[in-house]
């Protein structure tokens, strides 16, 4: 009887995982120009899903008449979400890249469930593919993503986006702000977010766990963020320290054994393979090199306090 109970529990767990075709198993690797052999920015995008990525979406460049609209269809569920105004010109896209060599990919991490917005139009997939048709550079893409979410609401869970063009590569963590209805409208529309430029010569990886921790508050060349990313966390009771100590991941997607062992461990594995077992990174103006094994207790869930660096070389 005990054996049967174990088998039933295992089958239930498998069903729970496969009920979501994405199964929370995406991995991105971002390689900057100085870290690649041909001086190219590179983004890899993998998902352990048998029902996704069997196609490449193609949209030709197009000019649109004034007053044209765009139907927003949820990328995961295919549910119609609503319509938004179309722009005058859209760029040609193939898969997750457009004609200007802008690339956007993602991994989902969920985060605090109370921050989901059930009234919103723009899901994470629509943000990616609409932005690819409207932006030419990574910086433009970040702004378009933010503007779309702020205008039409963000309809998905916490996400990390990989964003790169020919010159720059960025990582962007974001999560919605929940629902607070007033006069039939959500007055918390949009999301809180941080985007960090990956230094040239470095690589970055994320795998269904928010990766940005503390970040520079006065370096717009290399770090952009929502004006309320810290104040909103204070308001919700997620953070009560000094601004300079604010940790996005800790506030909006606290790490636990499951997320570290099943998610950050994949990012660690990418670092370990690509950096030959040695992590070199900058901390407080100093260059630090340490073995990948220094984070073994972290990625096995034994010590959640010793987080990995965001970028390594």
Regions found by a protein language model. Give the residues of each.
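Bacterial N-terminal signal peptides
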Residues: 8-18
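N-terminal start-of-chain detector that recognizes signal peptides
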Residues: 15, 75-77, 134-135
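Bacterial N-terminal signal peptides that target proteins for export
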Residues: 1-9
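A contiguous strand-loop segment
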Residues: 25-124, 144-313
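Second-shell loop/turn segments in exported
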Residues: 116-117, 126-135
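Boundary at the C-terminal end of the N-terminal hydrophobic targeting segment
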Residues: 19-25
């Amino acid at each position: 009887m005990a054996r049967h109970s174990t088998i039933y529990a295992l089958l239930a767990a498998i069903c729970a995982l496969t009920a979501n075709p994405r199964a929370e198993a995406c991995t991105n690797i971002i390689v900057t120009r100085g870290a690649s052999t041909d001086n190219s920015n590179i983004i890899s995008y993998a998902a352990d899903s048998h029902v996704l990525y069997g196609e490449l979406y193609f949209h030709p460049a197009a000019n649109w008449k004034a007053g044209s609209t765009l139907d927003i269809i949820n990328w995961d569920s295919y549910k119609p979400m609503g319509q938004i105004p179309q722009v005058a010109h859209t760029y040609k896209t193939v898969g997750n890249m457009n004609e200007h060599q802008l690339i956007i990919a993602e991994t989902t991490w969920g985060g605090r469930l109370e921050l989901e917005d059930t009234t919103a139009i723009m899901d994470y997939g629509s943000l990616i593919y609409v932005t690819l048709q409207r932006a030419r550079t990574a910086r433009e893409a970040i702004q378009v993503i933010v503007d779309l979410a702020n205008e039409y609401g963000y309809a998905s869970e916490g996400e990390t986006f990989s964003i790169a063009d020919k010159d720059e590569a960025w990582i962007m963590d974001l999560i919605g702000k929940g629902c607070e209805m007033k006069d039939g409208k959500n007055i918390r529309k949009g999301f809180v977010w941080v985007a960090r430029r990956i230094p040239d010569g470095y690589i970055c990886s994320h795998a269904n766990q928010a990766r940005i921790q503390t970040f520079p508050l006065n370096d717009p060349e290399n770090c952009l963020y929502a004006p309320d990313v810290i104040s909103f966390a204070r308001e919700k009771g997620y953070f009560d320290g000094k601004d300079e100590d604010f940790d996005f991941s800790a506030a909006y997607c606290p790490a636990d054994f499951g997320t570290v062992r099943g998610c950050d461990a994949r990012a660690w594995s990418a670092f370990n393979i690509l950096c030959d077992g040695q992590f070199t990174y900058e901390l407080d103006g100093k260059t630090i090199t340490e073995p990948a094994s220094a984070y073994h207790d972290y990625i096995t869930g034994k010590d959640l306090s010793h987080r990995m660096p965001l970028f390594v070389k």
